[in-house]
A protein has these predicted regions:
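Short, solvent-exposed loop/linker segments at the N-terminal edge
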Residues: 270-274, 392-398
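Cell-envelope and extracellular/periplasmic
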Residues: 1-373
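Ser/Thr/Gly/Pro-rich low-complexity, disordered linker/stalk segments of secreted
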Residues: 371-389, 395
Length: 398
């Protein structure tokens, strides 16, 4: 007696993509269709409303060119990453993309009724994973968000943004207990309703989340080509590059496979000043200049490195293994801070590691004096928190 006939059944690994529009990663210019494959799946969709997610009880072959309200959408870089994992390991991949464009980090927090209600973004994502029985199967979570917290009306302090994200990690670990790693795409210089001071705060918060937590990696997006709206990305050299860059990290962190060297973005670990010589130490094995035109690269460095003392400029530079040494036009005044903002996507305009990955942006690090109000946090690995992060709520509970 045949009770039910089931075909096209797969079993594999699960990843979550979350954030705002650059996590939704809709098609702006160029299709991701070449990455579609029968072994990449999406349940329902990352719908922005309750009724839509409740009414769509379908599994789809993953596609990347739709939007939040398109059934089966994984986002362009979510789809590309899934295909890369599948091709490398012969493992089917399910992507749960919960992104919602234009939303601040507060929007993604877990409400008290998330188990019983799909009115919230958190509740809708939880519903999809609970309905499919895959809550315990999530291996990793990838996050691209920050622009909505970097504008004139919704700025968060560095500590506020960090706390919101660490709260999310705590909730995600409770609800999806087998998440092994988190991947942050650092917000880049952009329009998107942002301003310069807001971007500095968000980027520094994201950097410190990676510095201070063992299970968080960060990937800069300076090296991605920006769409004409100076906010989103085309597919080629944009969203596809999101996947290409993060794929080797996923392979190493989650699957234990090393596919290439220099897969992590260079992070500042120390900064020191002697007269007009500024030394920036990174955790990279070696730094690389990608431009034989020294004058052009110095011009780029002057655009990327922003001193609070605007009379300071860079007149020369030297690379010494993992160290970038800048010669300044004068000794900085007392309480001078330095930020690296990252403007150009061109390889030749950036100091990178051996794989062409540029520096992680940092904000308002003190190079002379005490610099009250600067982040001043150059934590090293030994200061990192354990992989499962516990954060107190307003009542002192964890």
């Amino acid at each position: 007696l045949l009770i039910q006939d089931i075909d096209d059944l797969v079993a594999g690994d699960v990843f979550i993509v979350q954030g705002q529009s650059n996590a939704a990663a809709v098609m702006y210019n160029g299709s991701s269709g070449a990455y579609q494959n029968d072994y990449l799946r999406v349940y329902s969709g990352g719908y922005t409303g309750s009724s839509s997610v409740l009414s769509d009880d379908n599994w789809y072959y993953a596609q990347g060119d739709g939007n939040e309200n398109t059934g089966g959408n994984a986002g362009q870089w979510g789809l590309a990453l899934a295909k890369m994992i599948k091709d490398q390991l012969n493992i089917p991949i399910a992507i749960f993309n919960g992104a919602h464009g234009g939303q601040p980090i507060e929007f993604f927090q877990r409400p008290s009724d998330y188990i019983s209600s799909t009115d919230s973004n958190y509740g809708r994502l939880f519903y999809r994973l609970q309905k499919t029985g895959l809550k315990e199967k999530v291996r990793g979570l990838l996050w691209s968000q920050g622009e909505a917290n970097a504008g004139a009306t919704n700025n968060l302090s560095i500590e506020q943004y960090k706390t919101y994200f660490e709260n999310l990690m705590m909730f995600w670990q409770q609800d999806y207990p087998n998440i092994e790693h988190y991947y942050l795409f650092q917000t880049r210089e952009c329009n998107c309703g942002t301003n310069s001071s807001g971007r500095l705060l968000v980027k520094e918060a994201q950097r410190l989340l990676a510095v201070e937590n063992n299970n968080v990696n960060i990937m800069p997006t300076t090296g991605m080509q920006v769409h004409s709206d100076y906010c989103h990305y085309p597919f080629v050299n944009g969203y596809e590059k999101f996947a290409l860059r993060i794929f080797p990290q996923v392979m190493k962190d989650i699957y234990g496979l090393t596919l290439q060297e220099s897969i992590y973005a260079p992070m500042i670990t120390d900064i020191s000043l002697s007269g007009n010589i500024l030394e920036i130490q990174t955790d990279s094995e070696s730094l690389v200049s990608n431009n034989s035109n020294t004058t052009a690269l110095i011009n780029s460095l002057n655009n990327d490195f922003v001193f609070s003392d605007s009379s300071i400029s860079i007149v020369n530079f030297q690379l010494d293994s993992s160290k970038l040494i800048l010669t300044l036009n004068q000794n900085p005044s007392n309480n001078t801070t330095l930020s690296f903002i990252g403007l150009s996507s061109n390889l030749e305009d950036n100091i990178t590691n051996g794989s062409g990955i540029e520096l992680v942006s940092f904000s308002n690090l003190c190079i002379s004096g005490n610099c009250d109000g600067s982040s001043g946090q150059n934590s090293t690995d030994q200061d990192k928190k354990p992989a499962i992060v516990f954060v107190e709520d307003g009542s002192g509970n964890v």
